[in-house]
C-alpha cells in the first residue's frame, strides 16, 4: 500500500507532500481507521521514563504539535515534536526540502520554521495523547548567538509542565552559528544555565523533566570527547546522536549535491553510527543515548542499540518506508 502512496507523494513538491501526508494521517485517525495496536512490545527505561518500546519519532516531522494524537497511534514508544522557538518564525525561503531517492536521502534547510512555543503548548493541551512526549527546543534566527541561552530558557520554562522530556537542539546546520554552541565554554555555559532552570522548575511543578541535548554527526573524536565531558559534568539526563550532516560527498555528482542544508536518511547512516560509538565509549554508561540517523530498516535500529543506544528515533526512513518501519524496527529489536 505505502509504495503506491509514495509514488504519488514523490510526484509532489516535497514540502507540500509533507503537509498532505500529515493532514491525511490526521483524517484517517479521526475516522478511527488506524488499527489500535499494543505498543508495549519491548519496555525500556530511558532518562527515568518508562517507554513501552524503544522506537521513537524524531523531531522535525510535527514541528508544532498539531498531529500528536495521529502520530501516537502508529506504535511509537515515544514522540518528539519541534523544533520550536520562543517566537513564531517562517524559516528559510522555499524551496527548502529536497528528496534524493537514488540515495534514500533528504536534504532540508527548513530553518526552524514553526508557530512558536505558545501555539505548540495550546496544541498539546488539546491533544489526548498520554504517552511519552518530548519537546525539541531551539533559538530564533534573529537572536544573536551570544544571547541564545535566553531563547532556550524561555522555551524550557514554557514547555516544562507539558513535556515528558525536553531536547536542546544545538546541532541544526540551518540556523546561523548554532553549531558553535556544541563546543567548549559555550556548551558548558548553556547547559549549566538550563540545568539550573530545570532544578527551579522541578521545585515549582513537583516533577522532574529530563533534559537531553542533540548533537551533529560532523564532529571529530576530540569534539565528541569534549561534549561527553561536558554533559557528564553538568549531569545532563541524555544525549541524542545525531542530527543531519552537512557533508554531501556521499551523493557524488548528483544534481542536488550542491544544495545547502542538512542531509538525512541513508547517507548519514555511517557518520551517525560512528559518532554514536565514539560517544558511547566516552560517556561510559553515565547517561543514556538516543540513536538517530539513517535508520531505513529494522537491522539499522538493532545496530544502534548494539553500538550503545538505549533507544532510537526514526524520521527519513518513514518517508521512504512508511509506518511499517516502526513494526520492522520493533521486530528486529525483539530478536
UniProtKB/Swiss-Prot annotation:
Residues spanning the signal sequence: none
Pathway noted in the entry: Pyrimidine metabolism; UMP biosynthesis via de novo pathway; orotate from (S)-dihydroorotate (quinone route): step 1/1
Enzyme Commission number(s): 1.3.5.2
GO annotation, cellular component aspect: cytoplasm; plasma membrane
Enzyme class: oxidoreductase
Catalytic residues as annotated in Swiss-Prot or TrEMBL: 172 (nucleophile)
Residues binding substrate, per UniProt: 63, 108-112, 169, 174, 243-244
PROSITE patterns registered for this protein in UniProt: DHODEHASE_1
Binding positions for FMN per the UniProt entry: 59-63, 83, 136, 169, 214, 242, 265, 294, 315-316
One Pfam family this sequence matches: DHO_dh
Cofactor: FMN
One GO MF term attached to the UniProt entry: dihydroorotate dehydrogenase (quinone) activity
Keywords on record: Cell membrane, Flavoprotein, FMN, Membrane, Oxidoreductase, Pyrimidine biosynthesis
Bilayer topology annotation: Peripheral membrane protein
GO terms of biological process kind: 'de novo' pyrimidine nucleobase biosynthetic process; 'de novo' UMP biosynthetic process
Subcellular location: Cell membrane
Cofactor note: Binds 1 FMN per subunit.
InterPro entries xrefs: Aldolase_TIM, DHO_dehydrogenase, Dihydroorotate_DH_1_2, Dihydroorotate_DH_2, Dihydroorotate_DH_cat, Dihydroorotate_DH_CS
PANTHER family: DIHYDROOROTATE DEHYDROGENASE (QUINONE), MITOCHONDRIAL, DIHYDROOROTATE DEHYDROGENASE (QUINONE), MITOCHONDRIAL-RELATED
Functional note: Catalyzes the conversion of dihydroorotate to orotate with quinone as electron acceptor.
The family this protein is said to belong to: Belongs to the dihydroorotate dehydrogenase family. Type 2 subfamily.
Assembly information from the UniProt record: Monomer.
Protein name: Dihydroorotate dehydrogenase (quinone)
Amino acid at each position: 500500500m505505502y509504495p503506491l502512496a509514495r509514488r504519488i507523494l514523490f510526484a509532489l513538491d516535497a514540502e507540500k507532500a509533507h503537509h498532505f501526508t500529515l493532514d491525511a494521517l490526521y483524517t484517517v485517525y479521526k475516522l478511527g481507521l488506524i488499527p489500535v495496536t499494543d505498543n508495549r512490545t519491548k519496555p525500556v527505561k530511558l532518562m527515568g521514563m518508562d517507554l513501552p518500546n524503544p522506537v521513537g519519532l524524531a523531531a522535525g516531522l510535527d514541528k508544532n504539535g498539531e498531529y500528536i494524537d495521529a502520530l501516537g497511534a502508529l506504535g511509537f514508544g515515544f514522540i518528539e515534536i519541534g523544533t520550536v522557538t520562543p517566537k513564531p518564525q517562517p524559516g528559510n525561503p522555499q524551496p527548502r526540502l529536497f528528496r534524493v531517492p537514488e540515495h534514500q536521502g533528504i536534504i532540508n534547510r527548513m530553518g526552524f520554521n514553526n508557530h512558536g512555543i505558545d501555539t505548540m503548548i495550546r496544541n498539546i493541551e488539546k491533544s489526548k495523547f498520554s504517552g511519552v512526549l518530548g519537546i525539541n527546543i531551539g533559538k530564533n534566527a534573529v537572536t544573536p548567538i551570544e544571547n541564545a541561552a535566553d531563547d532556550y530558557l524561555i522555551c524550557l520554562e514554557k514547555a516544562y509542565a507539558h513535556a515528558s522530556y525536553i531536547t536542546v537542539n544545538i546541532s541544526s546546520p540551518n540556523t546561523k552559528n548554532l553549531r558553535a554552541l556544541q563546543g567548549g565554554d559555550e556548551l558548558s555555559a548553556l547547559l549549566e544555565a538550563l540545568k539550573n532552570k530545570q532544578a527551579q522548575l522541578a521545585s515549582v511543578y513537583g516533577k522532574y523533566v529530563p533534559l537531553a541535548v542533540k548533537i551533529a554527526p560532523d564532529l571529530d573524536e576530540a569534539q565528541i570527547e569534549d561534549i561527553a565531558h561536558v554533559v557528564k559534568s553538568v549531569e545532563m539526563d541524555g544525549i541524542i546522536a545525531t542530527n543531519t550532516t552537512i557533508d554531501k560527498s556521499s551523493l557524488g555528482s548528483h544534481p542536488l549535491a550542491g544544495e545547502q542544508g542538512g542531509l538525512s536518511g541513508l547517507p548519514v547512516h555511517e557518520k551517525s553510527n560512528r559518532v554514536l560509538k565514539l560517544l558511547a565509549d566516552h560517556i561510559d554508561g553515565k547517561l543514556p543515548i538516543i540513536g538517530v540517523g539513517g535508520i531505513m530498516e529494522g537491522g539499522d535500529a538493532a545496530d544502534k542499540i548494539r553500538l550503545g543506544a538505549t533507544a532510537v528515533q526514526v524520521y527519513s526512513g518513514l518517508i521512504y518506508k512508511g509506518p511499517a518501519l516502526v513494526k520492522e524496527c520493533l521486530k528486529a529489536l525483539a530478536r
